[in-house]
A protein has these predicted regions:
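An acidic/histidine-cluster motif and surrounding catalytic segment
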Residues: 1-101, 106-153
Length: 153
């Protein structure tokens, strides 16, 4: 795996300090974390009542280490979840051909970044694959290796 060609990570955060800390804690344990660029998109509070939690998340994000680079984008008005995500993804894809998108309530395995990056590279020219997921729906059948789930998107 070429560690110079890893997909940048977009993490979308809002007002959940505990969840954000756990997400970063787990993500930073990934074997490719130190070689990955992390972009954190922090939406502005909807109301004054959410300001303290949003600021706590923002303060925490300003101190994160353990990644190749970290850029925190602080929204100066509330975009809402959907627009924040669309704008953030568009921002990264202007300069990159691939992206790993995470929200602030996901706990990743230490091989998550390896798996996703290898899959993105392996299937980049396969028009039948439109996204790679790190989540599998609960299934009754047990699989020994990664598999395709048609119609998941």
């Amino acid at each position: 795996m070429n560690l110079e060609n890893l997909a940048p990570i977009a993490l979308f955060v809002y007002n959940r300090p505990y969840h954000t800390k756990k997400t970063i804690e787990y993500l930073s344990r990934n074997i490719y974390a130190q070689n990955s660029d992390l972009f954190i998109f922090s939406d502005y509070p909807k109301t004054y009542l959410e300001s303290d939690k949003v600021n706590e998340v923002r303060n925490y994000c300003s101190d994160i280490k353990k990644f190749k680079s970290i850029k925190v984008i602080l929204r100066d008005k509330n975009l809402g979840l959907a627009k924040n995500i669309v704008d953030g993804i568009s921002y990264i894809l202007k300069k990159n051909e691939k992206i790993i998108v995470l929200e602030d309530d996901l706990l990743t395995d230490k091989y998550f970044l390896k798996y996703i990056n290898e899959a993105l590279n392996k299937f980049e020219d396969n028009k039948d694959v439109i996204s790679i997921h790190g989540y599998i729906y609960p299934l009754k059948k047990k699989f020994d290796k990664p598999s395709f789930l048609k119609g998941a998107d």
